[in-house]
UniProtKB/Swiss-Prot annotation:
A GO biological process held by the record: protein import into nucleus
GO CC list: kinetochore; nuclear membrane; nuclear pore; nuclear pore outer ring
MF term (GO), any: structural constituent of nuclear pore
Disulfide partners: none
Places the protein is found: Nucleus envelope; Nucleus, Nuclear pore complex
InterPro entries: Nucleoporin_Nup133/Nup155_N (IPR014908), Nup133-like (IPR037624), WD40/YVTN_repeat-like_dom_sf (IPR015943)
Superkingdom of source: Eukaryota
Name of this chain's protein: Nuclear pore complex protein 15
Ranges annotated as spanning the membrane: none
Pfam family, one: Nucleoporin_N
Family: Belongs to the nucleoporin Nup133 family.
Length: 1129
């Protein structure tokens, strides 16, 4: 829901009411003649347990919880006499050391009058108090706050702040101060005394001139690493450290806050405002920082403007240097109250921030920052990070106090801000959806295991019933009789006699003891007598099985049988279990039977569904053999109870449930309530403190019997929801069932879920939070990882780190690595830290080098990248990436790793990379089609560069690329005979490329043959890469491609050449070689060729100006070469 759909409302708290005596006191304070009341707007408050109201010279206090059995009678206590207005800020109600009639702490109360007269009740039930006149130097008390609860005979301690800014510590006086309530007052910190007498003497006799400060309007304490007290006055904001104790820092409004307020006015007026005045109103802690409410005025406005500023958490340790965030508070309603000529608005505004709102990192699901006035309340909704706000404006909402009502007080609790009004009672200030009705009261029926305690008078009845159970279900052998008597003696608290009776059994092997105990317990839970009430019988079984567990534990039998193998026959099938499973099964079978009985008797629909279920259960062969016909008789056979949920789940089959929608949903709800009831009762039994804790073994009895039907029902619910025939209310109800039902299935399963299908379906149905809760609870790592991969980086990584710690024993870290690698999320995998992840990445070189770079292990990364580049035979782009990164890492290595091998590898393979990049796309498409990223060997590059091209220019460039490649390789391997042979073969291919029978003269060699054009290219063409001003192939490198023996090359040529052709070819090669020798002697600057298209506008102009000079320089260079050539000729 967006902020536009929210409205601020006064939500009535119906559970809190004013007692009759309090209402009478309100009436007594009403003056009919003047049509006004003496009740002030700061005379009432409350906390989590109590409410209190000041009325004239007394205080009323009563419990918040409304009792339906009796009227609320408040406690009345007398207040100290005062000539100044009282305030609940000087009242503290806390949990005292005394206990009331219901064993709960009886509240203590501390009241301080404005003049400093203290009254302290350690218990309101005693009505006795201690009164002391505090030495506060004639200052006026402003606020009292509790600092320490009473403990070890010491009274509670308090902090008292005066309107002059002085802080006093009130702590217990005497060794028994917790009972007497005696307190002593000590000044802790504050300004120099500014009491009434001091100010009067200063006026009469003069004194040292000091800058005066205004009176404190509010103060509060904040516990962080230190106990801080913040005092707010219109002109100064001060923070004291109580542990030092001293003033931590102080900020003057005029110097620190007023310039910020002036900037708002300047933005409005578009010029510098005149006579700007700012006044601090209130402050509160918000997101560890300090939120401050400020009022501001200027000359051209007749209103008081409201502003909020926020300072970061550094305020708790040092003086702030600036404001982090600030905003205007638009007070558009009740504008008459904000007149500049009326200063009362400053004292009638209160900043209220509940604890949960203050600690929340975002505004969602909070009521915002609330400002209260006797006539209205506003909320500022700040849905952004104050340090880095993304939205320029905050949400503002307003609500008016009912016009005929009167504000009595307010209270800031953990979740809400409460206001107490004369007529309307107590309400919370809530930011709710627009048009939202009064909150409905939802009650959650909890399944509670009944008490297992039995009084002395009850045991004879249980003992008689136990004898019937043993007699009907067990043979009369000495062992069973001894176990029976021993348990009877234990129940009657004759422990020694019980142990003596048990000696014969103790001497038996553990497995035999487990067998006897198992048969004894099953005789109890499978006992049934039609003369007994079902619920009474179930309660007896519950008590007896619980007490037997205690009996086994006390007698040392429990530890012996808990791991003993045990065979239990059910329906003719032998199930192998251990003693611990058997003990848990017995208790939980009784609990499940109780849950089924409770469900069956709750309403008629459930009873009808139960009848349909029992009819099918009675036809099961195992049940038929017992001859049971009474539908309720099965409750006496707890050993068969697992058939009921299984058959109940079958009732949801399409061919059983029926086509009528209303009937179908009735059966759905009935079955789901049954399964949920069984689940809740079993879980409650496992958590019950009155039973012996039994460890849950991997294969539990529920998994072997009926747990799978819970998954079946969950899948049927999902199928029903997908059909879309259910209403919104039915859909919500079914979703609630599926959470409970599937939670039980997962808890009983012996395998850890992984990407569970039902959980994925729940996410798709709009229950991701609940699905994640189940996935986290039952360690479905696949679902957890899959879901959080869709969140932002911060949330995802924070959650993964939390899971690594939470599931350390389950090795979530390695699961995460495998999942991310398997699903191609290498980006997330590389964000994981730790030595185990490093070891994992060592198995994957393509990931390992990234981690090594991140850890600044550049030497290791270079070696890894080199091996990857050497092994890459398919993708040229990957080869380039690996080779380039290997070189850069090697150059950056400072960890002592020997990277000479990497540098040598780069030197050898760099020519291949460089020349593969220069092969035109047209040639690559001919070679590989659309696979332009294919790797090419040196032979492939030579072959395709020398292939027949569409024109002579392309052919020349192809041979140039081939010779350039060979030249670069020969520079790396100068002694390679194989490269020299390839150079000769390339010259042979160049000569054979032409039809020499068409060449008639030496001039034709230059103009008509590829050989001649290539020779001309060697001495006259020096192209450069785009953006480079120097040629890609310099003369000194071009000299390397000359054949070692031109005669041999020409002899091997297949061209139809004559003697003249051969002499022309040799002459050409000789002339080119001489020209290249001369060019090689020239400096590199002689080949500078600026790219006129790749420079900026200023450089362009400069180069255009020098263009003619550079052209003349180039021409002189060419003329010089021609003259030298003519002279040699």
């Amino acid at each position: 829901m967006s902020g536009r759909d929210l409205e601020l409302t006064l939500d009535r708290v119906s559970s809190i009411e004013y007692p009759a005596l309090v209402k009478e006191a309100f009436l007594n304070n009403w003056h009919a003649s003047a049509h006004r009341s003496e009740v002030t707007s700061n005379c009432a408050s409350l906390n989590d347990r109590y409410c209190w109201v000041l009325s004239r010279n007394q205080i009323f206090i009563w419990e918040r919880a409304k009792s339906s059995h009796r009227a609320i009678i408040p406690t009345q206590l007398p207040l100290p006499t005062s000539g100044l207005p009282r305030s609940v800020k000087c009242v503290v109600v806390y949990d005292g050391v005394h206990r009331g009639a219901n064993k709960t702490p009886c509240p203590g109360i501390l009241v301080v009058s404005p003049e400093g007269v203290l009254r302290h009740w350690t218990s309101i039930e005693s009505q006795t108090y201690i009164e002391e006149v505090l030495d506060i130097n004639n200052e006026v008390a402003l606020r009292v706050e509790l600092t320490d609860e009473p403990i070890d005979g010491k009274s509670a301690s308090f902090l008292l702040t005066t309107t002059s800014g002085t802080v006093y510590f009130l702590n217990g006086k005497g060794q028994d101060s917790a009972k007497t309530g005696a307190l002593e007052c000590n000044k802790v910190a504050g300004r120099e005394a500014h009491g009434f007498r001091r100010r009067l003497s200063s006026i009469m006799f003069g004194g040292e001139s000091k800058e005066s400060t205004s009176l404190i309007t509010n103060s509060f304490q904040h516990q962080s690493k230190d106990l801080l007290v913040v005092t707010v006055s219109p002109d100064v904001l001060t923070v004291y450290n109580m542990y030092t104790p001293c003033e931590l820092w102080s900020l003057k409004t005029k110097e620190f806050f007023q310039p910020k307020i002036a900037s708002f006015f300047e933005a409005d007026l578009k010029r510098t405002p005149l006579k700007v005045r700012a006044r601090l109103i209130d402050a509160a802690v918000f997101r560890d920082g300090l939120m401050i409410l400020i009022g501001g005025t200027h000359e051209e406005s007749q209103s008081v403007h409201m502003f909020m500023v926020w300072m970061s958490a550094n305020w708790q340790t040092e003086q702030p240097t600036g404001v982090v965030w600030s905003a205007r508070v638009p007070m558009n309603e009740h504008r008459a109250l904000f007149s500049k000529i009326d200063d009362s608005i400053y004292s009638n505004l209160t900043l209220c921030i509940p604890k949960n709102t203050a600690e929340s990192k975002k505004a969602d699901r909070t009521d915002g920052i609330i400002i209260i006035n006797p006539y209205f309340a506003v909320s500022l909704y700040l849905p952004f990070d104050l340090a880095k706000p993304k939205k320029p404006e905050s949400l503002y909402r307003h609500v008016s106090i009912p016009p005929r009502d009167q504000l009595l007080g307010y209270a800031i609790c953990s979740q809400y801000v409460y206001i107490m009004m004369l007529e309307s009672g107590v309400s919370t200030i809530r930011l709710l959806p627009r048009g939202f009705a009064d909150s409905s009261i939802y009650t959650h029926e909890q399944v509670v295991v009944p008490s297992l305690s039995v009084g002395t008078d009850d045991w004879p009845i249980l003992s008689e019933l136990l004898s019937e159970m043993v007699a009907s279900g067990l043979p009369k052998t000495p062992l069973y009789q001894s176990l029976h008597r021993a348990f009877e003696l234990f129940a009657e608290k004759h422990m020694a006699e019980s142990e003596e009776e048990l000696k014969a059994i103790i001497k038996m092997p553990d497995q035999e003891i487990a067998r006897i105990v198992s048969q004894f317990l099953y005789a109890i839970i499978d006992y049934s007598d039609a003369a007994n009430k079902t619920d009474t019988e179930l309660h007896a079984k519950r008590v007896l099985t619980s007490r037997i567990m205690l009996f086994l534990k006390h007698m040392g039998v429990y530890e012996r049988i808990i791991s003993s193998p045990l065979g239990i026959s059910r329906g003719g099938i032998l199930s192998l279990r251990v003693g611990g499973t058997m003990l848990g099964e017995v208790s939980e079978r009784v609990a499940a039977s109780t849950a089924i009985w409770t469900w069956k008797t709750s309403n008629e629909t459930n009873s009808a569904v139960f009848d349909a279920i029992i009819e099918k259960v009675l036809r099961i062969p195992e049940v038929q053999d017992l001859g049971l016909k009474d539908k309720d008789a099965l409750f006496g056979r707890c050993g068969l109870v697992h058939h009921i949920p299984v058959v109940a789940a079958q009732q949801l089959e399409k061919n059983v449930i029926g086509k009528t929608k209303s009937h179908r949903f009735e059966v759905f709800h009935a079955v789901c309530e049954l399964l949920s009831g069984i689940k809740e009762t079993i879980i409650s039994w496992r958590n019950c403190r009155t039973k012996v804790a039994i460890p849950k073994f991997p294969i539990w009895w529920t998994l072997e019997t009926f747990a799978s039907c819970y998954r079946d029902v969950a899948e049927k619910i999902i199928e029903e929801l997908k059909n879309g025939s259910s209403t919104d209310s039915e859909r919500a109800r079914l979703l609630m069932y599926i959470l409970s039902i599937y939670d039980f299935y997962l808890s009983e399963s012996d395998s850890q879920p992984d990407n569970d299908k039902v959980l994925q379906e729940m996410i798709a149905l709009g229950k991701p939070a609940d699905a994640m809760e189940l996935a986290e609870k039952h360690k479905d790592f696949g679902t957890l990882v899959k879901n959080y991969l869709t969140t932002d980086v911060g949330t995802r990584q924070k959650t993964f780190e939390r899971y690594k710690k939470m599931f350390e024993k389950d090795d979530f870290e390695m699961y995460l690595c495998d999942y991310l690698k398997e699903h191609g999320r290498n980006d997330v995998l590389l964000q994981q830290g730790g030595s185990r992840v490093d070891a994992y990445l060592d198995n994957f070189k393509e990931l390992r080098y990234s981690r090594e770079i991140a850890n600044k292990q550049f030497g290791k990364a270079a070696l890894t990248l080199m091996s990857l580049a050497d092994a890459e035979t398919k993708s040229f782009s990957k080869f380039v990436e690996f080779l380039t990164r290997a070189y850069y890492c090697a150059c950056s290595s400072i960890d002592g790793t020997d990277v000479s091998e990497v540098l040598d590898f780069y030197k050898r393979r760099y020519p291949e990379m460089k020349h593969r990049k220069r092969i035109p796309t047209e040639i690559l498409k001919i070679c590989f089609g659309n696979d332009l990223d294919a790797m090419m060997s040196v032979e492939d590059m030579l072959e395709w560069n020398m292939a027949v091209q569409p024109n002579d220019e392309a052919s020349v460039e192809g041979f140039a690329r081939a010779f350039h490649l060979l030249a670069d390789l020969l520079a790396v391997h100068p002694d390679s005979d194989e490269l020299k042979k390839k150079i000769d073969k390339t010259w042979k291919a160049l000569v054979d490329y032409d039809e020499w029978n068409r060449v008639r003269s030496k001039e034709d060699v230059e103009k008509k043959t590829i050989f001649g054009k290539f020779c001309n290219y060697l001495i006259n063409s020096y192209p450069a890469d785009k953006g480079d001003s120097f040629p890609i192939w310099m003369p000194i490198s071009r000299r390397l491609i000359f054949p070692t023996d031109i005669d041999t090359v020409l002899d091997e040529c297949i061209a139809n050449t004559t003697g003249n052709h051969l002499s022309w070819i040799k002459g050409h090669l000789k002339w080119i070689g001489e020209q290249l020798c001369k060019q090689a002697l020239l400096p590199k600057s002689a080949f500078f060729r600026p790219d006129m298209k790749q420079v900026g506008s200023i450089s362009q102009a400069a180069l255009e100006a020098f263009g003619p000079i550079l052209q003349r320089r180039e021409q002189r260079f060419i003329d010089q070469l021609n003259r030298d050539s003519m002279m040699e000729t």
